[in-house]
């Protein structure tokens, strides 16, 4: 059992929790995720690690209530316990293995959309702790849905906030802001890291390809069971089949087949769609308790 030591509602239907999990906190790296189960019979819910504190032995998760599992999790309070908290899982962000001095010579831009701000934060924080200043674009549909602005502002070299409706700061999308920085403000970037909704990552990656900026995306949104068994996170990258929760979650943003992934993501929301995928691709497994037949 794992204790919930703090809980906050960041904005409407988006929650943050600090979970007491010393072993996970000790080994966690930026870019990784965990699998949480509310109770012994509950669904497996994969969530990106939004922060970790090795001294306190806590791991921070951020989630949006979009299905049965996350709605049940949102009903938990401080002092309650969840049944399972497994991790860290997935491949850590590629840059943590690079030479620090070489990283300092590069210009990085992070683009976070919506709840994508949470998985972007530990990467930006890691950069800040190692003396590497990075630019961050934080985008949302409107001001009320923005999260992690204060945290990212402290860790980023420069933070650019955008809202689709213009209710706060720059009016436009993250792509619009990136275009403004490069084309009108003379910014030059050696690498872009993009995390957010699939459609946002698709169009922002199209822009970075046009601008000649190597790009990494995190495909956390398409994960269901977190082991690759259910096949929901199956994605084609550079013509090869990959599984986001095992081979990723990070991939070359210019090689991902976003349209295929979004189609599969939509089909996995219905039993009819899952059946059709089994006809097209074969039954990836016998649904042995992975949780893929439920929603998060």
UniProtKB/Swiss-Prot annotation:
Transmembrane segments: none annotated. Residues 1-95 form the FAD-binding FR-type domain. GO terms for molecular function: 2 iron, 2 sulfur cluster binding; flavin adenine dinucleotide binding; oxidoreductase activity. One of its GO terms (biological process) is pyrimidine nucleotide biosynthetic process. CDD domains: DHOD_e_trans_like1. Coiled coil: none annotated. It comes from Clostridium beijerinckii. This is Uncharacterized protein in adh 3'region.
């Amino acid at each position: 059992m794992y204790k919930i030591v703090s809980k906050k509602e960041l904005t409407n239907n988006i929650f943050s929790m600090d979970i007491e999990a010393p072993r996970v906190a000790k080994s966690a790296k930026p870019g990784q995720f965990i699998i949480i189960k509310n109770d012994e019979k509950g669904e497996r819910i994969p969530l990106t690690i939004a922060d970790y504190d090795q001294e306190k032995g806590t791991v921070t998760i951020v989630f949006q209530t979009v299905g049965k599992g996350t709605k049940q999790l949102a009903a938990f309070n401080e002092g309650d316990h969840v049944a399972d908290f497994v991790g860290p899982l997935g491949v850590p962000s590629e840059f943590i293995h690079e030479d620090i001095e070489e990283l300092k010579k590069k210009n990085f831009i992070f683009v976070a959309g919506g709840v994508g701000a949470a998985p972007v934060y530990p990467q930006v924080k890691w950069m800040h702790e190692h003396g590497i200043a990075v630019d961050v674009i934080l985008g949302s549909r409107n001001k009320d849905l923005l999260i992690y602005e204060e945290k990212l502002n402290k860790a980023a070299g420069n933070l650019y906030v955008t809202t689709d409706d213009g209710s706060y700061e720059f009016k436009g999308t993250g792509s619009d802001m990136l275009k403004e920085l490069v084309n009108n403000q003379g910014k030059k970037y050696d690498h872009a890291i993009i995390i957010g909704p699939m459609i946002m990552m698709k169009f922002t990656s199209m822009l970075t390809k046009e601008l000649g900026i190597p790009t990494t995306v995190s495909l956390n949104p398409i994960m269901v069971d977190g082991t690759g068994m259910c096949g929901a996170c199956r994605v084609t990258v550079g013509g090869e089949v990959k599984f986001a929760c095992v081979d990723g979650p990070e991939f070359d943003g210019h090689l991902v087949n976003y349209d295929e992934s979004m189609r599969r993501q939509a089909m996995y929301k219905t039993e009819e769609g899952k059946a059709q995928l089994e006809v097209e691709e074969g039954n990836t497994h016998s649904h042995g308790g992975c949780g893929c037949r439920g929603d998060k």
